[in-house]
């Protein structure tokens, strides 16, 4: 009986050893699977990969630049020149003429158009047509006034005529006297700083020549 038990225990232990030997150990494929299943590291985005976002203000500036380039024309490096146009009847460009020659002084018999002319151009145009003042009054008052102005060394006029009258004019203030000036500025200064005789009227005008 004892022999049977010993034999049975020996066979059981030997079979247990063989089973332990047949158990599969940890294979290398399992380690590879675990390594593959491990989470991979994420790549940090580079500066070149990041998309550049533009603000709406910069987009508006770009659109305005494109519109300006479209209006001025592509490839036009020069800005359009501004032309100054006069307000006269012709509507053409205002060009500053040359200074009048001595023969051209007083050659114009029409009033100068002031629109579209610079100060220098206006003076040059008026030099061809000397401005004048026509005084109307009594003969005695005009003669006395002229005598005082001539003897006072008043140099703010060009010429002063004698007292004259139209033939057939029998009115009370029938006497006339002409005063010529170099420019309208001189004429305006003369009217501003001088008093005319009592009950005397004046008017502006110009002559073809003196």
Swiss-Prot record:
MF terms from GO for this chain are: DNA binding; DNA-binding transcription factor activity
| Record GO biological process | regulation of DNA replication
As for subcellular location, the record says:
Host nucleus
Which keywords label this protein?
Host nucleus
- Superkingdom of the source? Viruses
Query: Matching Gene3D superfamilies, A to Z?
Result: 3.30.70.330
Q: One Pfam family, please name it.
A: PPV_E2_C
Q: Where is the composition biased (Polar residues)?
A: 24-39
GO CC entries:
host cell nucleus
Q: What is its main location?
A: host cell
- S-S pairs: none
User: Which InterPro entries does the UniProt entry name for this protein?
Assistant: E2/EBNA1_C_sf, Nucleotide-bd_a/b_plait_sf, Papillomavirus_E2_C
Stretches for region Disordered: 1-112
User: Which family does the UniProt entry place this protein in?
Assistant: Belongs to the papillomaviridae E8^E2C protein family.
Q: What is the purpose of this protein? A: Plays a role in limiting the replication of viral DNA in keratinocytes. Recruits the host NCoR/SMRT complex to viral replication foci to mediate repression of both viral replication and transcription.
Task: Name it.
Answer: Protein E8^E2C
The lineage, from the top, is:
Viruses, Monodnaviria, Shotokuvirae, Cossaviricota, Papovaviricetes
